Amino acid sequence: MPTPSASSPQPKGFRRAVSEQDTKQAEAVTSPRFIGRRQSLIEDARKEREAAAAAAAAAVASAEPGNPLEAVVFEERDGNAVLNLLFSLRGTKPSSLSRALKVFETFEAKIHHLETRPAQRPLAGSPHLEYFVRFEVPSGDLAALLSSVRRVSDDVRSAREDKVPWFPRKVSELDKCHHLVTKFDPDLDLDHPGFSDQAYRQRRKLIAEIAFQYKQGEPIPHVEYTKEEIATWKEVYATLKGLYATHACREHLEAFQLLERYCGYREDSIPQLEDVSHFLKERTGFQLRPVAGLLSARDFLASLAFRVFQCTQYIRHASSPMHSPEPDCCHELLGHVPMLADRTFAQFSQDIGLASLGASDEEIEKLSTVYWFTVEFGLCKQNGELKAYGAGLLSSYGELLHSLSEEPEVRAFDPDTAAVQPYQDQTYQPVYFVSESFSDAKDKLRNYASRIQRPFSVKFDPYTLAIDVLDSPHTIRRSLEGVQDELHTLTQALSAIS
């Protein structure tokens, strides 16, 4: 089986075949699992991208042959059509431009912007220029205007305006990031373990209401968990904790001990998000925010940019304690929270979020896939051994065993490769990516993110909890002033100890 380093064979005790494991472990790896698909950010991001592409294709397909509006992209605004138009002039005489502009005057079009550009497709005998005009005209006159422009100009075509998708600029705007993916809701999915359990469904609605009513900055309301919910937690907690010493990474183990000491992590009590959020805030600046289910990929990643982790409060159904088709508090509290208490990993998580702000649907899908193979199912090397750091592994007994057995393929982490790697959401992953260290993974991610096409860069301001959009010399200079202040403080500190 390929591994990142052939010169460093893995200890037999950590990468064993399923057949070599004890009976309980073997059953956990091979036992039937919940047959519904696990929810994932990748699936949601893919659907968003495909929906946008389908809408664009439908618009083109619906255009009638010979229609002047065929393949023309415009925006409806108060009965007017607003669009960008590109065209080339016929001939080189100045009167050619006059004739073209006369058309806009005749139809009383309001011109917002006019400029010349180097022609992308220069015509023989014509100047190597084309004209870009953004204008507004009554919608009923648009077809006639375009027909007239085509009679006096060449290569007439509309240009879609590149719009940057909305993203929150202030932490308070996370209240708008609430788009849930409900495919695996117990009220809707026949295969969900809780579908036929009316009491469970009502309980989920009650807990979900906390998230729906929550506003950023408020204390997170406590949940009084039932005896059955605590019993489910106890089974998951005790089973997974028995594996952590040999399978979890060093950072997870250290944070888990602190959580047991300060946040009430124990078998007979489910920790409250408010207490855990205070703990994380003091450690790495991350905060928790209650959420009713799986958020859309764009909304979830945007939250990470503010060091806010959207966290569920409900618990999986008692009939399926070792597996859940959706994120629940076992997954969040046992898998994600300990890792978010590590400074380097917290920065890695925030970097993924920052890279997502204003990114295209295609890039969101790729970032979601990188997130899947790192934050959810990532492995790392420590002291020559493979260890798990992904929350999907650290909250699933069977997959944790599987990931460190000899069954799956293990590859060195490379964001470009991971971003397009097919993923598995019906059974265990056949492929995992291993990082040399969290610092190495962070550097590789930043290099990958620097190549995402956006007309700006972004920076998180920890004082105002806001996103600084760096899109002008002024905003960059202002950001540099803050860096200079920090460097001055560090220089003084070095002088004091030297």
Swiss-Prot record:
Q: Which InterPro entries match?
A: ACT-like_dom_sf, ArAA_hydroxylase, ArAA_hydroxylase_Fe/CU_BS, ArAA_hydroxylase_sf, Aro-AA_hydroxylase_C_sf, Aromatic-AA_hydroxylase_C, Eu_TyrOH_cat, TH_ACT
Q: Where is this site: Important for substrate specificity?
A: D425
A GO MF annotation of the entry reads: tyrosine 3-monooxygenase activity
Q: Where is the composition biased (Polar residues)?
A: 1-10
The chain residues annotated with the modification Phosphoserine are: S19, S31, S40, S472
Q: Name one GO cellular component term.
A: perikaryon
What is the required cofactor set for this protein?
Answer: Fe(2+)
Q: How is its activity regulated?
A: Inhibited in feedback fashion by the catecholamine neurotransmitters, especially by dopamine in competition with tetrahydrobiopterin. Phosphorylation of several Ser/Thr residues in the N-terminus regulates the catalytic activity. Ser-31 and Ser-40 are readily phosphorylated to activate the catalytic activity. A Cysteine modification induced by N-ethylmaleimide (NEM), inhibits tyrosine 3-monooxygenase activity through the modification of the Cys-177.
The knockout note for this entry states: Homozygotes deficient mice are deficient in catecholamines, and usually die around embryonic day 11.5-15.5 due to cardiac failure. Increased number of persisting retinal hyaloid vessels due to loss of hyaloid vessel regression at P8.
Ordered alphabetically, the record's keywords are: Catecholamine biosynthesis, Cell projection, Cytoplasm, Cytoplasmic vesicle, Iron, Metal-binding, Monooxygenase, Neurotransmitter biosynthesis, Nucleus, Oxidoreductase, Phosphoprotein, Synapse
Q: What EC identifiers does the entry list?
A: 1.14.16.2
Q: Where is this region: Disordered?
A: 1-33
Protein known as: Tyrosine 3-monooxygenase
Q: What is the lineage of its organism?
A: Eukaryota, Metazoa, Chordata, Craniata, Vertebrata
